[in-house]
C-alpha cells in the first residue's frame, strides 16, 4: 500500500502579508494619521505638499497683553459669503472693566509724552502697517467681501490716515492754543489737554479704515482708548492690535474687546471711569440711549450723522479732520499776573 501524499501549502498563502496587529488601546485612526504626517514631511518643500493648517486664535487686547475673555466664551465669525473664518472672544462686562482699568493706568504715561514723541509713535504704527499690507488686504477681502483693488485702497487709506494724524500730534496745541486778550494786568492762556479715557465703538461695516479714522484722533492728543470692535467683522481690528503691540504705543493706551455689542456698549457708556464716548459707530437711536447712560458722569459723546452711517464715505476728506481731535480734548485756561 502506497503512502498518502502530503498536501503542499499554496504559494499565494505563504507570501500573503499579514495585517498589522493593532492594540486594543491604540485608536484606529492612529496609523493613517501618522502616515499622512510622514507623507507631508517627506514632501516638504514640494508643490502640493499636504500639511495641517494652523488656525489663528483671535483674543482680546488689554493692557498690552492678549488675554482670553474671563468667561471663556467665543462666537463664530463668518466671511462675506457666509463661510466660517474663525472664532473670536465673546467679551463680557468684566473684560470692559479690566480694559478701562488698564486705560486709566496708561493714560498719564501717554499724556505726559511730548507731541513730537506721540507723532513718532503714530508714524511707527503706519510703518508696521505698511509691512503687513498684504495680510490686511486679504483679511479685508474676506471680511468685507470686496475685491483686491478695493481692499488695497482701503488699507492704503488706513496707513495714510495714521501718517496724517501723526503730523498733527505736535501741531494741534499750537493751532488751538492761544493767548487770550483780557482787560487787566494778566496773561490769559488757553491750552488743549486730553480728556482721559475714551470709549470708542468701532463702525460695524468699515472694519479697518473706519476704526482707524475714529481711533487715531483720540490718541493724537494723549487720550487712552477702550475699543469695542465690529461685531460681525472683528478680525482686522484684532490684527491691528498685533501691530500696536509691536509698536512703541505703551501697553494699555489702546485696549480692544470683541463680542456682541448688546452685551458691551451699555457697560462702556455707563462706566464711571470713562471720560468720553465715541458713539459714531452706532445708529442714531442707539447713540441716544448711550447718551442717557453717559449722563451719570457727564461724559462727552460724539454722535453719528443724523442719517446714520449707511452711505458714509470713509475715503472722503471729511473722514479725517483736526476738528475730530478737538472732540476729545478739554481746554484749560490759566491766569498769570503781569510782572513789573
Task: Show where each model-derived region lies.
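N-terminal Rossmann-like NAD(P)+-binding subdomain of aldehyde/semialdehyde dehydrogenases
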Residues: 3, 16-186
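A charged, well-structured terminal subsegment
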Residues: 258-280
Amino acid at each position: 500500500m502506497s503512502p498518502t501524499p502530503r498536501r503542499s501549502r499554496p504559494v499565494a498563502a505563504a507570501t500573503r502579508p499579514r495585517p498589522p496587529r493593532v492594540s486594543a488601546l491604540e485608536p484606529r485612526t492612529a496609523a493613517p494619521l501618522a502616515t499622512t504626517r510622514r507623507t507631508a514631511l517627506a514632501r516638504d518643500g514640494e508643490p502640493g505638499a499636504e500639511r495641517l493648517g494652523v488656525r489663528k486664535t483671535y483674543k482680546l487686547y488689554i493692557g498690552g497683553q492678549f488675554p482670553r475673555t474671563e468667561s471663556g466664551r467665543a462666537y463664530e465669525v463668518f466671511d462675506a459669503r457666509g463661510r466660517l473664518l474663525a472664532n473670536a472672544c465673546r467679551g463680557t462686562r468684566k473684560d470692559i472693566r479690566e480694559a478701562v482699568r488698564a486705560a486709566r493706568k496708561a493714560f498719564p504715561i501717554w499724556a505726559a509724552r511730548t507731541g513730537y514723541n506721540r507723532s513718532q509713535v503714530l508714524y511707527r504704527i503706519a510703518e508696521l502697517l505698511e509691512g503687513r499690507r498684504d495680510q490686511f488686504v486679504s483679511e479685508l477681502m474676506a471680511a468685507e467681501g470686496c475685491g483686491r483693488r478695493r481692499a488695497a485702497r482701503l488699507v492704503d487709506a488706513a496707513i495714510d490716515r495714521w501718517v496724517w494724524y501723526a503730523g498733527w500730534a505736535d501741531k494741534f496745541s499750537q493751532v488751538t492754543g492761544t493767548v487770550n486778550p483780557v482787560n487787566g494786568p494778566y496773561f490769559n492762556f488757553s491750552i488743549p489737554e486730553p480728556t482721559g479715557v475714551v470709549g470708542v465703538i468701532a463702525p460695524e461695516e468699515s472694519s479697518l479704515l473706519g476704526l482707524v479714522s475714529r481711533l487715531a484722533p483720540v490718541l493724537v492728543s494723549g487720550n487712552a482708548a477702550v475699543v469695542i470692535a465690529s461685531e460681525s467683522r472683528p478680525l482686522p481690528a484684532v490684527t491691528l492690535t498685533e501691530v500696536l503691540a509691536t509698536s512703541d504705543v505703551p501697553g494699555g493706551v489702546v485696549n480692544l474687546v470683541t463680542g456682541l455689542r448688546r452685551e458691551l456698549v451699555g457697560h462702556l457708556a455707563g462706566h464711571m471711569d470713562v471720560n468720553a464716548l465715541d458713539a459714531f459707530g452706532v445708529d442714531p437711536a442707539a447713540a441716544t440711549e448711550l447718551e442717557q447712560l453717559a449722563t451719570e458722569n457727564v461724559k462727552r459723546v460724539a454722535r453719528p450723522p443724523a442719517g446714520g452711517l449707511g452711505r458714509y464715505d470713509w475715503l472722503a476728506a471729511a473722514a479725517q479732520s483736526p476738528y475730530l481731535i478737538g472732540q476729545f480734548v478739554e481746554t484749560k485756561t490759566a491766569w498769570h499776573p503781569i510782572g513789573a
